[in-house]
Structures are given as structure tokens and as C-alpha cells.
Amino acid sequence: MATKKAGGSTRNGRDSEAKRLGVKRFGGESVLAGSIIVRQRGTKFHAGSNVGMGKDHTLFATADGKVKFEVKGEKSRKYVSVVAE
């Protein structure tokens, strides 16, 4: 015989998988061409020199060098560049 009353059901208990977004290579770090620098939703960071942008807004190095983050422009946008060593 059951010693506990039947529990009701719930409509909660779900969550989406983490997408592992964010900065992958920080300022001053050396990168090779093709290295992912930032994974993002939208353009939180914009592509500077020697940096390309994928269709999902991922920023990647197009040349070997060191990563440089800078804020510039009238709208104070954050740019990511790769400076050749």
C-alpha cells in the first residue's frame, strides 16, 4: 500500500542549454589566423582590422598577431582588432 499520496504534475523543470558565448581570446593574447576571438549574439563587439565576422556574428582573426580591444567612434562602439607582431 502506498505510504504517500500521489503528487501532482508540474509544468516547470525545463531550461535551454548554455551557448558558451563570450570573449575567447583577451587583449594582448597571441592568435593565429582563423582563431575565434568572440562568440556573441548581435554585434556587442565590432570587427576591427584583421578581424572577420561570421554569419552568427562570431569574430575571428584573419591574420596572426595580438588581440586589441578598443572603444572608438561617436557611438562608443567596442572594436576588436588583431595587431601584427
From Swiss-Prot:
One function term, GO molecular function aspect: structural constituent of ribosome
Gene Ontology biological process terms from the UniProt entry: translation
Any one cellular-component term (Gene Ontology): cytosolic large ribosomal subunit
Keyword line: Ribonucleoprotein, Ribosomal protein
Spans annotated as Disordered: 1-20
NCBIfam families linked to this entry: L27 (TIGR00062)
Family (UniProt): Belongs to the bacterial ribosomal protein bL27 family.
Protein name listed in UniProt: Large ribosomal subunit protein bL27
